């Protein structure tokens, strides 16, 4: 059961080679939120943010086509300051799926218990 307590924002580095990289592990009793994702892709390709549950069902939350060395900056939902860009339900892990190159950057996230 959620206690409706919200954590402070946590920042961490992201390095995601071609394929699937778990950037936030699943938590059975908490929601995870990504407020900001900033970085670039080493060569042209796509970056997708995906929620995957324990049954391996996928929810694609966003896919972005990037050129060689092109940067990506995603922040809280536009016009709704403080509302996270990406939300992960209890039991879902956050996965960054890349094609073409390595995504290098950082993310800011929070947790609701």
Q: What is the meaning of each model-derived region?
A:
Residues 1-113:
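Beta-strand-centric surfaces of beta-sandwich/beta-rich domains
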